[in-house]
Amino acid sequence: MKQYVKTNKILLALLALCVLVSLAVIARRWQAEASNKRYDVVLDYSEMELLAEQSEHDVSWWLGQFRDMGITKVGLTEESLITLMENSPLAVTAIPMDTVIQDADWRSNYPDSFVQRIDRRGFDRFDVLVEVSGEEAIEFVTQGIQGRFDPDSYIIETMEAPYLPYSSLYPASSSDEDRAFLFLDGEVNDALYLSDTKYMTTMRKGFSQRNEIKASKLMYLSLGLMPEKVETIQELGMEIIPRTLAYDGHNDARFAQDVVRGYNAYGITPEYIIAGGEAVIGYDDEEDDFALNYFQDNDITVGLIETNVQRENIMQSGIEDIAKATDYNVVRVFSVWDYIQYRYAYYGYEGAEEIENTLYRAIVERNIRIIYFKPIKQNDNSYAYITDMDVYRDMFESLDRRLEAHNITRGEATVMDNVQVPSLAMLALGLGAGIGGVLLPATCLPMKKKWTLILAGAAAVCVAAAWVVMPNTFRLVASFASSVVFACLAAAFFLMAAKESSQVLPSNAKLGRILPRAAAILAVAVLLSLAGAMMTAAPLSSTDYMLELGIFRGVKLAQLAPLAFFCVLFLAYYGLFEKSRRANTLRLRDIVGALNWTIPVWVLVLLAAVGLAGYYYLARTGHETDVSVSTLEIIMRNDLENLLLARPRTKEFLVAFPCIMLAVYAAVRRLPFWTALFGLAGTIGLTSVCNTFMHIRTPLYLGFARTAYSLVLGLVVGAVFTGCFELLYRLFLIARKKYIEAEQK
């Protein structure tokens, strides 16, 4: 190793400078994260209504209970034709034209003048017919349509009571009330179908596929706030966070202006905007900045709703444009999805502990600053809510106590400062990745200093060219390259150090001499990986990545590549499990020997087991996987979260870090096969350290705490495991000696 350092000291010094640059970049991000320490809760009004229906109290009582807990904001979704039909006293019926025209006599069910206007205009199956009864309903619906739809996209016909001439197939109400009939012009992209609809034969075989239109986006388009609901919330002194559902193709400046008029009519200037549907209001009209000006003039924070797999955000039209235009005056929003609502009395808990754990992780680990809260449901009943207020009170009180350890409090949600990586710093980070890449082959190939420097110069030219030509892609490539390169360098270090240990210590050295050396090698290897983690995180340490408007790409490849490199390293240092190999360079005969190796059956079995373990390890990576974590492990994780500032990674402190110590032990004992096996498992831990910091949304202090806990626990577990392996090895030697003696008799 000394020779390696001496030969490459110039490049190693340059690499150290690049790491220092990464620390400077990381320091700016640290400051931004340190000031982002307040979260807020917004109640979902519609589900609060459903909760109230199943309890002995009305919705006003329930809202008041949450208000008394300090939760003062309520998300109120504007009404649409769908909500008016399904959950309001107003008499409204909306039907896709595809359904209407299936009745050959449909014209007789509507006023002649209305039908004639439709015929003159022309219609298709993507349109919608609406029937409204009652003065209040007519006023609400027609004002919403006239204010938010293009004048050329609808027909309205009103009929004063008594209304007798026609017998509608879909009567909205009695005939002694005024009625209105509306035709809404739809497009093919507005149509909504049921998935996988088909006719079946009596033999349960598919007969024909059906593509019946069951609804339209026009039926979900927001029309306005319901006055009674607004009054209920405002009488309690609570703040309304209006939610408007906007859809592409029906979301121009006219729509946005009418939405804002509706807000102003009730004196609502929202603190946050949590967009619904497909877009932020007004973002069909690229030439009109009305919506953006409204957000900026009123200092409104826009919510980025996290997806239900807890990765990235739901990217509605206009979200990213607004984020950039408002200097990232946005916050991440965690919606309590239905599968989380059901986690009451889950994993053996008695109450809402697992829901609390979910909220805790969202706030602490993923930069979530608004919880869009929906009431808890029973885990064995999809429709029954938990109606015990003490459950909610206890959950939020416990959550706030746990968040105190992170200096996070509840109140007006804080906004992340806009932090960007300076251009020259980005170049330095890319050069660091390039230099590290040049140092890798020098760990296992006989490269002279001159050729290493020439290769480094060529790498620098390529890096600089990429920095100029593709700056956006450059940051991702630099981050990915650093994650691979430094994990490989750390693996090379501990394998070099393990082999040197075998040359310094005798094969029968006492465990007391091996363990301190193994612990030191583990600590240095983890520090090298941590330096790589800084180089990995630094290029992406900007606000857009912290808010998951962009994410690290290539996680699985970054985990696999160092494992493959370790195999090459081992072949260079040990050949085919040679006990007394002196050279540390890869030779052609090593490769030929490996290709011609006759593998024993027991090795094949062991490799198959290792392969299955590797597949399980990779398959569990990320949220979108079918390989689930066991209940026992989840409970253990939750307990660690409660005890420690950050939960250490199980694979690090229970497997990978102890295996690095075992690899050193096996090297000293001249057990090259076990050095290879334990070393391969240990390399997983070094990639895991870098992987921890690939999650840019996670605050840095958690990554440092997690790695520190893993290292400390890994040292303890590693010492225990090494002691156990030493005992087994001694028993094996005794058994083998007795077997040989018995064979000689």
Model-derived features: positions:
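Charged, low-complexity intrinsically disordered segments
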Residues: 29-42, 485-489
